[in-house]
Amino acid sequence: IEFWRGVPLITVLFMSAVMFPMFLPADFFIDKLVRCIIAISLFEAAYVAEVIRGGLQALPRGQYEAAKSLGMGYWRMHIFVILPQALKLVIPGIANTFLALVKDTPLIFVVGLLEIVGMLNLAKTNPEWLGFAMEGYVFAAIIFWIICYAMSKYSYNLEQKYKTER
């Protein structure tokens, strides 16, 4: 986990897109999109794991002891007592991590894959679209804002539904 958290996402994407194929056998091929999805997944999983670890550490020791006193085994204790409480506590942190993931998607343009900002950069070089770059950027900003606002409102609603304050 510390490795993935200690390396910038742009470096992880560059390594997955450019360096990783150099270490594969010549007849073995993994598409660049798949490599980037795996790299982003590993990167974001490290951050989500840290958020969940924080939630687990925030629970009082008494919760563990109470579950053990009821005769629950390790897995049963975690599935039915500990994780539901910890996940309820970390809703804001997980939502923040997913919002950061959405905001990090334009970085895949650096390794040659296109997303909304990458397509905009490609379109503004087209002679038919000269002079319309500002409108494209405004449109992209509105799309990102709508997605992030919707995710933020959903997170807020989850917090209210489950009363995540301590």
Q: How should each PLM-predicted stretch be described?
A:
Residues I1-R166:
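Transmembrane alpha-helices and adjacent helix-loop boundaries
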